[in-house]
């Protein structure tokens, strides 16, 4: 069933007593009895007070699973990552064209610019990443998702390469380089998923793995997070 339809049904069921109380209040109010209308307003107030925290909690947990939280991991932890680290919640479990062999990973490029110092790192977010079945033993699916992490690291290193080649510290220019790297990384990630069909096209998956590994090796000297300017 469509997840939006499910949400609509849940709200209708939750608020059905509210609608019934409103009907009774309007009916009584027309007869000159205003007490039911006052009771309805009070009932509505408490209903809203309950549902708003529930919605907020629902939204927070959908974004990040704080009930089973694991802090973001830097790229040096790459080899340790397995589907056990995918702790994100999906209240309405998704699938890929009906196939339960499905997962997604959340990564980011984080930066900090201080006086004459720039720190840039790629992060994998366990509590925002999701796998349909944690006990899946699909090595192909895990490899596909982990290469998303490598791609983020690749564009992090590309940004560090460009920043390292600046003649002097320039905060505005550095921010532009990082923003462009983030945009290029997002575009590359989308193309990767499209070309590999989320790991199902094995030949494309292997092509991307070879390309990404090769580029990462070429940028090995930029794996350290911190860049310092001495001018």
Regions found by a protein language model. Name each.
Residues 1-29:
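Membrane-embedded alpha-helical segments of integral membrane proteins
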Residues 24-45:
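Amphipathic, cytosolic membrane-interfacial segments at TM-TM junctions
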Residues 39-64:
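Internal/C-terminal transmembrane anchor helices
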Residues 63-77:
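Ser/Thr/Pro/Gly-rich low-complexity linker/stalk segments immediately outside membranes or between
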Residues 73-90, 95-97, 108-115, 120, ...:
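Metalloprotease/metallohydrolase-associated module, dominated by Zn2+-dependent proteases
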Residues 117-134, 158:
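Short acidic, glycine/tyrosine-flanked loop/strand segments centered on an H-E-D-like triad
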Residues 140-153:
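Active-site recognition of the HExxH zinc-binding catalytic motif
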Residues 152-169:
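A short beta-strand-loop micro-motif that forms or neighbors metal/cofactor-
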């Amino acid at each position: 069933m469509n997840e939006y339809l499910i949400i609509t049904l849940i709200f209708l069921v939750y608020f059905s007593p509210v609608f019934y109380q409103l009907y009774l209040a309007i009916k009584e109010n027309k007869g000159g009895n205003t007490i039911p209308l006052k009771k309805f307003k009070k009932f509505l107030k408490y209903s809203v007070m309950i549902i708003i925290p529930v919605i907020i909690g629902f939204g927070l947990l959908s974004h990040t699973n704080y009930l089973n939280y694991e802090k973001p991991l830097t790229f040096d932890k790459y080899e340790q990552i397995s589907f056990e680290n995918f702790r994100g919640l999906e209240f309405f479990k998704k699938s890929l064209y009906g196939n339960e062999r499905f997962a997604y990973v959340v990564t980011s490029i984080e930066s900090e610019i201080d006086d004459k110092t720039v720190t840039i790192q790629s992060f994998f977010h366990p509590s925002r990443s999701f796998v349909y079945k944690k006990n899946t033993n699909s090595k192909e699916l895990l490899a596909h998702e982990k290469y998303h992490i490598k791609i983020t690291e690749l564009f992090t290193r590309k940004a560090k390469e460009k920043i390292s080649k600046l003649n002097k510290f320039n905060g505005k220019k550095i921010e532009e380089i990082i923003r462009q790297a983030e945009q290029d990384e997002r575009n590359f990630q989308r193309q990767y998923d499209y070309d590999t069909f989320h790991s199902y096209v094995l030949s494309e998956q292997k092509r991307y793995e070879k390309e990404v590994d090769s580029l990462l090796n070429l940028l090995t000297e930029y794996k350290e997070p911190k860049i310092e300017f001495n001018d």
